[in-house]
């Protein structure tokens, strides 16, 4: 089987697109603890600023509803690099570090291009939220 070679220009293009789309969904204030919620079809999502520095912002994205008793709801952590204008998934579903490539087969059953796939998933999710989502605005 041919060894997988990451396509770096494609990965950077994907991360740049994720950065521009994710910025449109983030809370206006980038202080840690700030959150914003979205309703997309019958699902609810929450974006929370975990950390904000001069050059980076760390965001968690969690599905909060509908709750399914036998399945954990999707969540991921994304780091935005403001100087490079890219956003990259740092962790997802208890996987806390993604390698650029994995040998296959491997003990944890990661795909050879797991890092690219999880960032592509973020891109697809962002595109879907921007096309079909509505912001949940609290009424006081």
From Swiss-Prot:
Task: Extract the Pfam families matched here.
Answer: DUF1249 (PF06853)
Lineage, opening ranks: Bacteria, Pseudomonadati, Pseudomonadota, Gammaproteobacteria, Enterobacterales
Designated name of the protein: Uncharacterized protein YqiB
Source species? Escherichia coli (strain K12)
């Amino acid at each position: 089987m041919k060894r997988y070679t990451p396509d770096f220009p494609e990965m950077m293009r994907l991360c740049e697109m994720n950065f521009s789309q994710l910025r449109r969904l983030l809370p206006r204030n980038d202080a840690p603890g700030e959150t914003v919620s979205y309703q997309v079809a019958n699902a609810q999502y929450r974006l929370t600023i975990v950390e904000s520095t001069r050059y980076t912002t760390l965001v968690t994205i969690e599905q909060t509803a509908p709750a399914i008793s036998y399945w954990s709801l999707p969540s991921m952590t994304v780091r935005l690099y403001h100087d490079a204008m890219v956003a990259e998934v740092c962790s997802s579903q208890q996987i806390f570090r993604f390698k650029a490539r994995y040998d296959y087969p491997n003990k944890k059953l990661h795909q050879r291009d797991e890092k690219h796939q999880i960032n592509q998933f973020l891109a697809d999710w962002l595109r879907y939220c921007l096309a079909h989502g509505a912001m949940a605005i609290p009424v006081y």
